Amino acid sequence: MRKHLFGVLSAGVALSLVVGGQSAAEPSPQVSQPDPMLAFLPAEAQVDWAAVHRNRESRKQSRVAGKAKTAGQPLTYSEKEAAGTQGGNDTPTSAEHVAGFGTGRGKNPKLTLTGDLASDPTIPVVPPFAEVNDAIPLGSDTGVPARGKAVRTSGTIGDGPYGSAGDGSGDHDFYKLTGGTTGLFATVETNTPTGDLDTLLAAYDETGQLMGQHDNLSGSTDSRLQVYVPPGANSYVMVAASGPGGLPSDPMTPGTGKRVLTEGPYDLTIATGDGQGDSDHFSVDLKAGDVLGASAAGKATRVVIHDPAGREVFGSSQDFSFLYAENSPMPAGGNAVADFVAPKDGRYTVGVENGEGRYDVTVEAYRPGSELNQRPEVLTIFLDFNGARVNTRIFGVDPAGNRDLSPLRKFLPGWGLTDADENAVIDNVVATVRENIEHDLAANGTNRRFAVRVLNSRDHADPWGQPNVSRVVVGGSIAESGIQTVGIAQSIDAGNFGKEETALVLLDVLSLPAGQSRTSLNTYLTPASAKIPFIGRAIGNITAHEAGHMSGSWHQDQFNALDSIMDQGGNPKGMFGVGPDGIGGTADDIDVDFQEDVLNPNEGFSGIEDSLNRTAWAYTRGAN
């Protein structure tokens, strides 16, 4: 059974670590919850999802507010399929071709697609559920997914005992979604064609933990939320009025709202994405290395990209553009955002799905950031083993500030090593990073202009602060950094437009005594192990993982049969390359690389991600 394991060590474990001579009595900053999408997390994972979602909403608003419009008028294209009908462009093979779009000479790299999604006639409609359903234990049972793939119902905010006609604490309608044998994502959307109601959607687990919330869809007072329903468990969706105090103080107890806000009727649709709703597909011609971004607004809530062979290579029902590099030009905002790097020339399709009514989709294409540099400039990845001062605000955590991180050598005793072993460990880390990035991407990627320079603090002067230099700090601890993680990157930057970013690989959990964490390297060491090569390879793989984020790759599925550098945390044995014997540093160990693999299903994306070529095209020799 797949385990839903991404998260972080509890503060009690993390802050009690005594690693490499660091005492728990030493002053340490308050520990922050990182965004799991940016981090490589320990296997013993507990995430403060309420904190994660608060942080995401804050960063999302800041990203959209700060996004400057790029110059140039977009090409516009309206779908040819008649409004309210299906069948004309519903698959990648029947996509409508948009000529004139692209990054080549005489092409327009900006495109606006408009169209209309017809309703799904197969969604069953059920009568409104009876009050009182104002708390999780009283949630109305929708039967999704057991009832089928979707359900449509209606309700009223203000019709129960807690509305303006009751005690005035505010009406909250809860709906139960029942998990099956496997986890799934459900898309929940409100529609308020009449009345004054401005809806708020929120999702909770069975214990009342807030999992997410959404206020207004672009251009309306309606709401849409993607909800994860774990296998064998239930999730709960709440419909309420938007505004200050919209969430109840205790979702387990009815009547715990703060005030009455807007009231009125609403329609509610809950769908798993497996129905027969309309989808519209449009084809565009891309060149190898083109960085494609798409953002859907209006009534469309999913955007999907297919390659020339018809494979889904990126599907998204969410906006995570706030994780892009600060200066990334890629489209942001809207209901769903996707990004993709074309590994070869060809005709690709952009699909619009999951909704009913008018939509517009912004599609833009760029060449990789480093390709715009002067000849013959190349990007540098600097591996810093000497310790560093890092302002953790760049990782989007709160609280944040300047943090001093200890060097690699401080953690050597945790593996039973001494200062005399430091050079050998560094040799193996550097060799692994170079094999994963310099060698494999040059040998196996499609970028004939691939070029990158990997430097390190032992053998080279520190170039950090110079143009075109990103760094990975290998050292420090949770207590020192204030971030509960093993690894974290500054951004997920398709096209590598940031070019001067920072990632961390913390070493305290990795050097815990055997058995205290499955993410400790000591757990896999025995007298039969080639200890230093194994330690160097494991740290090198995590270092390459964080560099992979900064160069544009998202997490891949860590629990399938294929071990990949971009696998999410939770299966450290795979990331470390431990072979079938369960022992690190033996002959059956596995060479873990960047490669094609399934995007991590627990992060809400779908499709096959080619992390090898996403990373290869991020490091392109300057062409200007």
Regions found by a protein language model. Give the residues of each.
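Secretory targeting and sorting signals
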Residues: 2-27
